[in-house]
């Protein structure tokens, strides 16, 4: 590769740069922040979705609902400093993401491994959306999913971008950029 996977992982805070640093410009270049960890990326409302859902996405021993909700861990606690999952507060968000992303789940308490690969990937996208990110970083998210699920994915990402948020999408498939991206960066050498 040419470093594009590493770049995306560093930007999302899931990997560390061996040297140098990563800065994200905001407010039309008038301000910036650095990313040194996943916690810093999350603090700045950056979410990450990998195309390798088996290694970097699904938690196979958890239910569909738990896989969607895990990103909200602590975000809905009514007691400051207490980090636990409040299912009453989270159920509505989980139901909304399942409906919005048209995830074909069956009973939501089933293990996530009961879903097709495309629906597992939709759960990963829903998990990211549930954190209300301003920047969504995706690393080859359409890898190994069917054509209709790809179309659904692209529509959700376009809607997210049209709402004023940023999508950073890494792919090695040129066709994925046509009609989808406003800017393309090519990594070479």
Mark where each language-model region is.
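A short, surface-exposed alpha-helical micro-motif characterized by mixed small hydrophobic
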Residues: 177-179
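Helical segment within the ABC ATPase nucleotide-binding domain
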Residues: 151-163
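A short, proline-enriched helix->beta-strand linker immediately N-terminal to the Walker B motif
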Residues: 130-134
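ABC-family nucleotide-binding domains
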Residues: 139, 146
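Conserved P-loop NTPase catalytic core
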Residues: 8-115
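H-loop/switch region of ABC-family ATPase nucleotide-binding domains
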Residues: 171-172
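Short, glycine/charged-rich "phosphate-handling" switch motifs in NTP-dependent
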Residues: 183
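Hydrophobic anchor residue at the start of the ABC signature
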Residues: 125
């Amino acid at each position: 590769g040419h470093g594009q996977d590493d770049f995306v992982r560093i930007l999302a805070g899931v990997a560390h740069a061996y040297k140098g640093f990563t800065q994200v410009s905001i407010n039309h270049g008038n301000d910036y922040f650095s990313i040194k960890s996943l916690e810093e990326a999350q603090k700045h409302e950056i979410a990450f979705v990998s195309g390798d859902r088996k290694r970097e996405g699904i938690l196979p021993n958890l239910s569909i609902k738990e896989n969607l909700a895990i990103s909200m861990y602590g975000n809905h606690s009514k007691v400051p400093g207490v980090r636990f999952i409040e299912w009453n507060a989270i159920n509505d968000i989980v139901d909304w993401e399942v409906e919005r992303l048209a995830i074909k789940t069956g009973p939501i308490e089933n293990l996530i491994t009961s879903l097709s690969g495309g629906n597992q990937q939709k759960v990963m996208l829903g998990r990211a959306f549930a954190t209300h990110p301003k920047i969504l970083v995706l690393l080859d998210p359409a890898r190994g999913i069917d054509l209709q699920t790809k179309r659904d994915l692209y529509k959700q990402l376009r809607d997210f971008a049209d709402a004023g948020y940023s999508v950073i999408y890494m792919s090695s498939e040129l066709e994925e950029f046509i009609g989808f991206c406003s800017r393309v960066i090519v990594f070479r050498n």
